[in-house]
Amino acid sequence: MRNIRSGFIWLLVALVGAFAFAMLALSRGEHVNAVWLVVAAVACYSIAYRFYSRFIADKVFELDDRRLTPAERHNDGLDYVPTNKWVLFGHHFAAIAGAGPLVGPILAAQMGFLPGTIWILVGVMLAGAVQDFLVLFISTRRDGRSLGEMAKQELGAFAGVITMLGALGVMIIILSALALVVVKALADSPWGLFTIAATIPIALFMGIYMRFIRPGKIAEISVIGFVLMLLAIVYGGNVAQDPYWGPFFTLHGTTLTWVLVIYGFVASVLPVWLLLAPRDYLSTFMKIGVIIGLAIGIVFAMPEMKMPAVSRFIDGSGPVFAGALFPFLFITIACGAISGFHALVSSGTTPKLVERESHIRFIGYGAMLMESFVAIMALICASVLDPGVYFAMNSPAALIGTTVENASQVINSWGFIVTPETLALIAKEVGENAILSRAGGAPTFAVGMAHIISEVFNSRAMMAFWYHFAILFEALFILTAVDAGTRACRFMVQDLVGVAVPQLANNRSWFGNLAGTTVAVAGWGFFVYQGVVDPLGGINTLLPLFGIGNQMLASMALILGTVVLFKMKKQRYAWVTILPTAWLFVTSMTAGWQKIFHEKPSIGFLAQAKKFSTGIEQGTIIAPAKSLKDMETIVFSNQINAALCGFFMLVAVTMLIAAFFAIRRALRAEQPTAHEVGAALREEAGRS
């Protein structure tokens, strides 16, 4: 009887989800209620977690709670600590959820809400959550080893070193893209910058409070920190209007880049408990709380999605990013469906904290579903805005100009009606001087979120507060990832350099730490600066590189997972990883090839470099450049991007070839050859 009731409930969930999808897909030019998208997403996540993740856990991985985890075997109170699964879920989610799920879906909305919705949901169920689950599992079975170390074990030393180099390159690009989003959101925004700056002393106070005043009172200090942040948002409006402090906190992009680089360096070398840990707690509560609150707000407000299901820009002519739906929609959405960055987290701190093997499913598969839900919320925030407002915020100034009158005229010619008065009014409502060309996705998410919450309360009087609350929320999302990512990048640099200079590999050496941090910060700081001074806007060139590198790293993680399944003699289940691997590999390689060699300057790095090089030779200034120096910057940026893209492709192909030979050897072997740590069973540990 119980099985019948359970089956009926899940059948009902499936039917409701199918009906919601039908409402989204079959709209004929009519505005669709955003509630249907929330319902479809929740139904998909529920079914995928209940059935597909259980199948993987029970049949493919055979998770066994009798096996001691690395946290139990090496419990040292420092790196290896058995952690409650709910606490670890929050830690893991805070680490993986950066700007990607917020930015990618918003940019992808230029093609309409339906293509992005389908990939976010299908991609996370069959690829993204599978990758996170897989890497966390194989790392836990190998004492929490990193992705590069596992590749070295399973594929050979050469493939391992290549993987480590590729992972470091991708990490630098990821951090630079995240930091550039922060710069784009806070440049010339005194209210936003003051609010974010205020979180630093707040986090320091929280760190001291938890360590010396009230140790262990995480919930207590998190509430205090949250209240202090709300006060900072409120007071930020006064700061922006102040004749002295307003200009003081009004920083241009280049200055803000240097400030962020210095902050990243200091945050990376400070003790974790002083800044990173308290910000981690705050961001976890903020991330999960705000996303759930936003979903509830959508249910109550029931806003209509004004963006068409499929727009005219699926042909690749869109102003937000260039390129056709395949492959560029998939690399643009990136983290909302699958992220290679997660493979670094899932083989970093998280496997050293897992308390039971059965928790891997909840933490690995479940946290990625939560991040995908963040992507759905971002897509909704972009889609509930008038398309004219959306394109005004996300199109480069080179296309729409710098005045509301010019922007309105250009966007109207695209078939999306928006008036200068509307653009000026929205800027005034959110407390900004202008909203034009605020690329990067963060401002668009903030305006969309403020719009939804204002509809819940049926008042637009608080639009400015909710806008800056959303900016704070996003910045916490991003800065948490930048903080943790810079520290992880430092470890990767030290590991690589330590091969030649062993002293630098010592994480307890101040010289090694400072040297590694300097290289890491200089790496991502360089690309942020290039993005800021790029006359094309930076986002348009850096984010495709971020997406390609990120997706290639994900395909590499899945390739490693496929090899491990063959070496475990689980080849009958290898389709679980082979299918997403094949799709990701083809997509990312196609995107990489097009970004390097495409004949259109709006798409191909080399074509764009050639276009502006020719202009320099002829002494002709080509818009949006305003000088020959601007054109030289564009040429240099495109040449660097093409070289990096080619490097990522070479790394992925090298790993695929190494995997092919490793699988051949595994098939010839009669016994499993996977390099797992010997199983210590809980009963045996208790008797010994």
Name these PLM-found stretches.
Residues S53-V81, L107, T117, L121, ...:
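Flexible loop linkers connecting adjacent transmembrane helices
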Residues G90-I96, G123-D143, L147-G148, K152-I221, ...:
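Helix-loop-helix module between adjacent transmembrane segments
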